[in-house]
Amino acid sequence: DEGNTKMRIALISTTQVEQFDNPDTRGATDTLPGVFRCWDPSRLYEEVKTARENADFVIVCIHWGVESEMQKEYRQDILADGITKAGADLIVGGHPHVLQAIGAVNGKPVAYSLGNFYFTSYTTDTGLLQVQFSAKEKKMTGLRFVPCLQSGTAVQLLEGAEKERVLKEMRDLSGSCGVSLDEDGWASW
């Protein structure tokens, strides 16, 4: 809030991975809660368009990709293209359980996978996204990858050589997608 200037942010959460109902992740219906499946993305695109009409900024959080693969897959790019064309300003992905690139699709940032933030008892690199907004301008003014380590179901911010190691990994992954990360993790595309 900058001088009582407000910004409306829409958040849509969906899964492209789970195609079928199971007891843990039942699909949402008009009368029952559950997950929003987008194996057929047409409904997702409509929801993004509706959100775009009612919000200043639209974020789509999506469960997608291939587990344990650090490289994004072609289906993620196809879906990201449709989501951004429908009006999303930022896509944040998960499911691979490892870090994947931060890229740009149609000029909009896509964090393909931030790894595991709080999931298992093993040790793995992970990260946060810091999104900076200007409510006055009604837009995102910065995007930063913050390196973390998940160990024993606890997450810690990384510093020093470990922070630089994870930032280098993300720079290498993201560079092939046209995104650069500075020494503090701020992205540019």
What is each of the regions a protein language model found here?
Residues 1-189:
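Acidic, metal/ion-coordinating pockets
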